[in-house]
């Protein structure tokens, strides 16, 4: 599925272009992925999101 609308990472404006016309920042798709209760990889996405938000100076290791 192709999404038309994109959101600028820098300024947060919405546009239809790949580069923001206001600040020349990179744009991404603002829509979340589709939810499926049978998703096998949700564990890995949540883990990646949590480690991305957590400061790396803690030095803790995550195990499954």
Curated annotation (Swiss-Prot):
Keywords: Ribonucleoprotein, Ribosome biogenesis, rRNA processing. One of its GO terms (biological process) is rRNA processing. InterPro entries: H/ACA_rnp_Nop10 (IPR007264), H/ACA_rnp_Nop10_sf (IPR036756), Nop10_arc-typ (IPR023532). One of its GO terms (molecular function) is snoRNA binding. GO terms for cellular component: ribonucleoprotein complex. Involved in ribosome biogenesis; more specifically in 18S rRNA pseudouridylation and in cleavage of pre-rRNA. Belongs to the NOP10 family. This is Ribosome biogenesis protein Nop10. It comes from Ignicoccus hospitalis (strain KIN4/I / DSM 18386 / JCM 14125).
């Amino acid at each position: 599925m192709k999404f038309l609308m994109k959101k600028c990472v820098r300024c947060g404006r919405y546009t239809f272009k790949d580069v923001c016309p206001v600040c020349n920042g990179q744009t991404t798709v603002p829509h979340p992925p589709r939810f499926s209760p049978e998703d096998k990889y949700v564990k890995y996405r949540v883990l990646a999101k949590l480690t991305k938000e957590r400061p790396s100076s803690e030095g803790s290791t995550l195990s499954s």
